[in-house]
Amino acid sequence: MSKIYVIGVGTGSKDCLTLKAVEVLQKLDVLYCPTSKSDNESIAFSIAKDFLKDDIEVKNRHFPMIRDREKIKGIFKEMADEMKNDALSGKNVGFVTIGDPMIYSTFIYVLENLKDNIEVKTISGIPSFVDVASKMNFPLAFDDMPFIVIPSIADMEKIEEYIVEFDAIVLMKAYKNYGEIVELIKKYKLENNTLVVSNSSRENEKIIVGKDIYTDENCEYLTTIIINKRWKL
């Protein structure tokens, strides 16, 4: 039976790939790779490439960084149709994404157009916030604590509400309004309960803790902020 594989390649290092991800990558005939710019190499591909067959067909696909879902719906449908046709022709088809495919992944929008038409097999990957929390021995949640994961493109008033309401907060892709978020951390005196990581597990990884978060001006696209009010660094 034809199926499409979506593979989470984890945080940024090939060492963080799961054995299952490697097994699937090694058997693919066609691999779709999302890029944020038309001339950029996919970050996910750079992690996965050492495990691919020599004769694999790689299809880089540019996804414009816009929030108007109606405007880009046609792009996702076109890609879903192309992937489905490749799979129905007998090829092993894959799509790679950083982190986990079901957490703020581009593939989710493609999945909307595939889920009723063909089997999709998802291979989980390690999200950046899990990787860095473990690396720094910084608990995400314990006892009766709920924790919330939110995109930093959310309204700042909403982000402040979450910071007040929850004991543990993960803010994904904090590059856009990093300064405003840092001001909230300062306002609620949470600098010693906050961890900032950019480019987790990559060569240019940067981890910032404590009051150093106030002096960092060059926030990268792949920046995650973790706050735990019950745990001090």
Write out the residue ranges for each language-model feature:
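Class I S-adenosyl-L-methionine
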Residues: 2-14, 21, 26-118, 207-208, ...
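Short gly/pro/ser/thr-enriched loop/turn and capping motifs at secondary-structure boundaries
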Residues: 38-41, 66, 127-130, 178, ...
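Residues at the C-termini of beta-strands that transition into short coil/loop
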Residues: 8, 35, 62-64, 124-126, ...
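Short acidic active-site motifs
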Residues: 20, 82, 155-159
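Class I SAM-dependent methyltransferase SAM-binding "motif I" and its flanking Rossmann-like core
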Residues: 102-165, 230-231
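A polyampholytic, Gly/Pro-enriched intrinsically disordered region
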Residues: 78-86, 140-151, 213-224
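A contiguous loop/helix-start segment that scaffolds small-molecule binding in enzyme catalytic cores
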Residues: 4-6, 163-233
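General beta-strand structural signal in soluble alpha/beta enzymes
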Residues: 33, 60, 95-97, 122-125, ...
